[in-house]
Amino acid sequence: ALRSSTNHAKASTALGFPLVPQNLLEIGDLDGPTIIGLLDLAIELKADPARFSQVLGGMSIALIFEKPSLRTRASLEVGIHRLGGHAVLFDQQDSLIGARESVHDLGRNLERWFDAVAARVHRHEVLDELATYCDVPVLNTLSDRHHPCQTLADLLTLHERGLVLADSHVAFVGDGNNVCHSLIQGMVAVGGRMTVISPEDHGPDP
């Protein structure tokens, strides 16, 4: 894990932004100022991608997908490549995490080879367990309860259009699903308001 810690610090220095916390399992892991800082950084990256082309230089990122994906997989692979890193895909659709070997063993092995792990899973508990046993950053790219990357993208859209998130009121219409849960957390963190309109018995978790 020493190599990973060193690379993690180098990436933070290159970005000019501390990469904390260690894991991103849900938006609730981030406070408001950190979210705004990430959004500002994303705008800088979009404006001058060459400046960030080696932020992940020398790093290998594991991508674990228990569920089918087009946009998430493509954006992660292309994004990691454009930042100078190397992505390795593990397609787990036919053999879910923990079925062939324990999550403990999986995490202990991945931390020896990779600088970070991004996982798209059916059960959020798998991410919690993976983060417990894997001594490199774990990123939730979708679970049954949370979708933090989608919320950061949604908030970035509002932020880019000049909206002050703390003064914004977002309406969510649909099932109270993983996207809804994360957006609620995000709006609370930045000090905004949110109204959820869902079918009866299909609202967000309490």
Task: Report the location of each language-model feature.
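Generic structural "secondary-structure junction" signal
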Residues: 26-32, 58, 98-99, 140-141, ...
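Glycine-rich phosphate/diphosphate-binding loop of Rossmann-like nucleotide-binding domains
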Residues: 66-78, 161-206
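Positively charged, low-complexity intrinsically disordered leader regions
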Residues: 11-74, 78, 146
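N-terminal acidic, proline/glycine-rich, low-complexity intrinsically disordered segments
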Residues: 1-3
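N-terminal polybasic/positive-inside topogenic patches
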Residues: 5-7
